[in-house]
Amino acid sequence: SASKHCRVILAGGTQMLAVLQLAKYIGYDAENSAIGCTSYIVDDSQAKFLETVEQIDNIAVLSCDPCLHNSQHFGLRSYADGFVKEGAGAGGAIIASLLKTENSIEKLFALFEQEYKRIST
């Protein structure tokens, strides 16, 4: 398991619950591991994400609010409104960026807005 050699962030929304269960089965280092996701996953009462993590193992859960509710774009606001579930590692990618760079949520949000505008026009 990679977690025995380096720090690992599992990123991909609720799908990572299955990965965590598999990691526990094959053996991993929980101290070197965390699940990274957006606040949309953690705050989703239907997903019961934190409760399920606790049932599987004692592992850190890192979450971030990408502030998409402030977006000028309906497509991005849909995430904050609960209409879209990412499941693509967005939260983990944001967390990794915050940990490894001098980015802030505000800087990243501005980049999200810029890129969304670029690809949608």
Question: Where are the regions a protein language model picked out?
Answer:
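Helical "lid/coupling" subdomains associated with nucleotide-phosphate turnover
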Residues: 1-121
